[in-house]
Regions:
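Polytopic transmembrane helical bundles with strong interfacial aromatic enrichment
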Residues: 1-150
Length: 150
């Protein structure tokens, strides 16, 4: 069983999976700082910076999050039955991934778009969404490392 998990094809998919995770979650940690740093800029510049953040979220970060989960499912399928979705850690990780996608698409990207259009009240929603997304990411990371139920 472990031979399949450690073979070159599996390892290549694992590298791309980890890379997708890094790309997907970079803004969850960086964007709150960028938003605070834009406060010293005039409103037009501030809205332009936030607009770029939102566009990158749709073009780069959201697809990376989707790819990270799909590659995770691919790794499960490549594991020669070593890992199965019936295992607690994978089931919970999949649930976290779905929740993170819902947060990103349903709250964070929408709030960033509203902020880019001048709605300063949306900043709090974006910050809360990013915070919850970060916590879900940490939970998923713990699940992936400790694998409860494996």
């Amino acid at each position: 069983m472990l031979a399949m998990v450690r073979d070159t094809g599996y390892n290549l998919v694992l590298v791309v999976h980890i890379l997708a995770v890094v790309v997907a979650f970079a803004p969850a940690f960086v964007h709150p700082f960028l938003v605070r740093q834009t406060r010293s800029h005039d409103l037009a510049d501030r809205f332009q910076i936030i607009s770029l953040m939102q566009e990158n979220g749709q073009r780069i970060y959201a697809p990376a999050l989707a790819a990270a989960g799909l590659l995770g499912f691919t790794l499960t399928g490549m594991s020669d039955q070593l890992y199965q979705l019936s295992q607690l850690w994978l089931w919970l990780s999949a649930g976290c991934w779905l929740a993170m996608n819902g947060l990103l698409h349903g709250l964070i990207l929408k709030a960033e778009k509203q902020m880019a259009n001048g709605d300063t009240s949306a900043q709090k929603r974006a910050e809360i969404g990013s915070g919850v997304l970060s916590l879900l990411f940490i939970l998923t990371l713990i699940l992936m490392i400790f694998k409860p139920g494996f």
